Amino acid sequence: MKARIVFAIALLMLLGPAAAQQEVSLVGTWTGQRERSAKIEGYRGGLATLVITEQKGRAFKGYLSRTNKEGDEKEELWGAMTPGGRLIAGADDEGVYSFLLINQNTLDYCYVESGKGPRAVCARLVRKR
């Protein structure tokens, strides 16, 4: 009996990480307040909305909308993640995103552009249900 319990515990320990690495779905609409620092435009905040429209395995695509003084902007992005979603990265035509999945419905992101007008922005986003 004791051997069966030890075997069951060992089996759970081996299967636990595999179960944790099952596919993570980012599809949906995520919103939150962003804060940005830029060389030219300075500091700015506002609403950010990330919409992941499609996901195939660990790769995904979508767009990020944000509000500015000049009006709303919408930029397409493409991304991928490691098994289990521990490391998530993305890119658009100008910069690079890094993501951290806090829980099933909370996603932190930062975005960076380099060059003559560098900028960095970060936000905590919550998935709308």
What residue ranges belong to the model's regions?
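Short, exposed beta-strand-loop hairpins at the edges of beta-sheets
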Residues: 98-102, 107-119
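Tryptophan-anchored aromatic micro-motifs
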Residues: 22-44, 109-113
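N-terminal helix-cap/turn-to-beta initiation motif at the start of protein domains
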Residues: 19-31, 53-57, 127-129
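Short hydrophobic/aromatic-rich beta-strand segments that constitute the beta-sheet cores
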Residues: 32, 60-64, 86-91, 107-113
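Residue-level recognition of beta-strand termini and adjacent short loop/turns
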Residues: 56, 83, 103-105
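N-terminal glycine/threonine-rich, aromatic-flanked beta-hairpin/loop signature
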Residues: 41-80
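Bacterial N-terminal signal peptides that target proteins for export
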Residues: 1-7
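N-terminal signal peptide c-region/cleavage motif recognized by signal peptidases
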Residues: 15-17
